[in-house]
Structures are given as C-alpha cells and as structure tokens.
Amino acid sequence: MKSEKPDSLTPVQWLICVIAVIGFAFDTYELLMLPLIIRPALEGLGGLKFGSPGYNQWRDLFFYIPAISGGIFGLLGGYLTDKLGRRRVLTWSILVYAISACAAGFATSLPVLLFLRCTTFIGVCVEFVAAVAWLAELFPHPKQREAVLGYTQA
C-alpha cells in the first residue's frame, strides 16, 4: 500500500510547528545572552575589573564549561530520549532549563552562577535533542519532515 504525500500541514501540525519555533527561539536566546551579561555579572558578583587576569579566567570558564557540559549531556539526552521516551525527557529538560535560568537571576556568587549556567545549558541541549527527535516522529513523510525540521530551526 502506498502512502500518499501530504500536500499541506493540518492545523494541529501547524500548531506543533509554531510551538517548536517558539521553543527553539527561547533556546537560541538563552545561549546567546552570555556575551551581553558576562561583563556586568563578573563585575557585580566577582568584583572583577574588565581585562584583569581574574576577569579573563572567569569569562573563559563561563563560555567553555557550560558548552562542554551541555554537549556531553546532549549526547546522553539522545540515549535517555530513546530509553525513557521523547515526551518525558522533553518535559524534564524544559523544567531543568527553566528553573536553572530563573535561579541564575538570583545567583549571589560566580561559582553558583557558573553551576546554574551549566544546568541551563544541559536543559537546553537535552531539550533540543528530544524536540528534534519528537518532531521527526510526528512528521513521517520524508519531505515534510525535512521541511518541518529545517523551518522550525531556521
């Protein structure tokens, strides 16, 4: 039996795409905010002067450690997504991401802020993996799946 190529998305599929775009926009926002907040954070929480060795060291840590932790847990997220299910992992990763990002606003020291940035990146990276896998499952036709994944992440 041949499966027919769908001509367009259903209203529910459009809603899923819109929600995915909004979610990916928040992910991008969160990941790209660091260059804007790093200087005030290091000066305010650490009392560090711009360009000093301590400032440069903390700046580097804030850029590299969260990225490494997010990358490692993103790989682990793929495994967890397969084992525990896309929806469950997606839900928990969004909670980790949201709680960590909110708590980071109340950080009182640089180590606490760094830890919360790491957990935020972990949540974002795991959420991204789970969301892409779930979108791929929801759109079984190859051309439609390619278009949906491309447009929602653009």
What function would you assign to each model-found segment?
Residues 1-154:
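Transmembrane-helix signature of 12-pass secondary carriers
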